[in-house]
Amino acid sequence: MIEIEKVCVDFTAGRGTPTRAVDDVSLHIAAGEIFGIVGTSGAGKSTLLRTLNALTRPSQGRVNVNGVEISALDGKALRQARQRIGMIFQHFNLMHTRTVAQNVAFSLKAAGWERSKIAPRVAEILTLVGLADKANRFPVQLSGGQKQRVGIARAIANHPDVLLCDEPTSALDLETSATILALLRQINAQLGITIVLITHEMNVIKSICDRVAVMSGGKVVESGEVFDVFAHPQHAFTQQLVSHTLNLTLPERLREHLPGQLLKILFIGDSAEQPVLSEVAIKFGVAVNILHGKIEYIGERALGILVVQLTAPHNPTAVAAAVEHIRQRTAQVEVIRG
């Protein structure tokens, strides 16, 4: 579906030294998947996204969409290719003097639709995004979430193959963000549209994406299935993002003063639902104190992370045996202290 091959993007201000915003990025995005690109501000993710519809041209490398090298197109050929690629934005980009229906109809008129077919399509797509009763409202009369729904309706009205999402929830509150992400999942499942989404929030990636690329300093430092990236982050930057998202940092006071061993335990799949710690307490006679933890469901797979304290003041070898038992029954054990 989408092939990004060794893409670099340089920006030059005046006669200054070029700044490399995207540095040698190669990615394959399969048809029908929801692919996330995550990174902090300045990581290059927005610039990379804009190469997919040639709003930004690569300085080096190629971008192919549906077998067509879009980075090499211009004029009429580029306009035709862009009709197969919808895009939504962080700040909605609606025309404030036009109604909801007129905003959606505009994209169809620009694509050359017959006048008689525009109104039925607008009604159909507004029903899909839950705005059938808002067709004659103006953007100023809408909430932020409703404005983004108009943006989505406009972007998918022309039956695109690809939907590019540039920070689609960053201007919204948590509850509204969840409804927008649910709508994007519905559109992906119902219409089969490939979605490429950029965000600075790993929670967004966790809730909607099939695969993810992590960007830092213009480079993709890690990529893979979302569950695997959360369960086994390889790059230090990814580890930082995941740790912040799962919020498993212990106060230093606890790390320094609690007796016994402190462990961070990763449970994957079935092991997340097994009574491993109860077994340890009974079998080895150790005291188990759960300090922090949670079980996340990413897709349909469980990922459990616990921070626990193990103590057995009168039988130190029991703690070591308990740790080994936990290692055998879980995916990963990290000794934080002890």
Swiss-Prot record:
Binding residue positions for ATP: G39, T40, S41, G42, A43, G44, K45, S46
SUPFAM superfamilies, per database record: ACT-like, P-loop containing nucleoside triphosphate hydrolases
Record-linked CDD domains: ABC_MetN_methionine_transporter
A Pfam family reported for this protein in Swiss-Prot or TrEMBL: NIL
Source taxon at top rank: Bacteria
Record GO terms (molecular function): ABC-type D-methionine transporter activity; ATP binding; ATP hydrolysis activity
PROSITE patterns for the chain: ABC_TRANSPORTER_1, ABC_TRANSPORTER_2, METN
Subcellular location per the Swiss-Prot or TrEMBL entry: Cell inner membrane
Major site of localization recorded for this protein: membrane
Reaction catalyzed: L-methionine(out) + ATP + H2O = L-methionine(in) + ADP + phosphate + H(+); D-methionine(out) + ATP + H2O = D-methionine(in) + ADP + phosphate + H(+)
EC code(s) of this entry: 7.4.2.11
The ABC transporter domain, residue ranges: 2-242
Membrane topology (UniProt): Peripheral membrane protein
Keywords: Amino-acid transport, ATP-binding, Cell inner membrane, Cell membrane, Membrane, Nucleotide-binding, Translocase, Transport
Function text: Part of the ABC transporter complex MetNIQ involved in methionine import. Responsible for energy coupling to the transport system.
PANTHER family tied to this protein: AMINO ACID IMPORT ATP-BINDING PROTEIN, METHIONINE IMPORT ATP-BINDING PROTEIN METN
Family the entry assigns: Belongs to the ABC transporter superfamily. Methionine importer (TC 3.A.1.24) family.
Protein name stated in the entry: Methionine import ATP-binding protein MetN 2
Organism: Salmonella typhimurium (strain LT2 / SGSC1412 / ATCC 700720)
Primary gene name: metN2
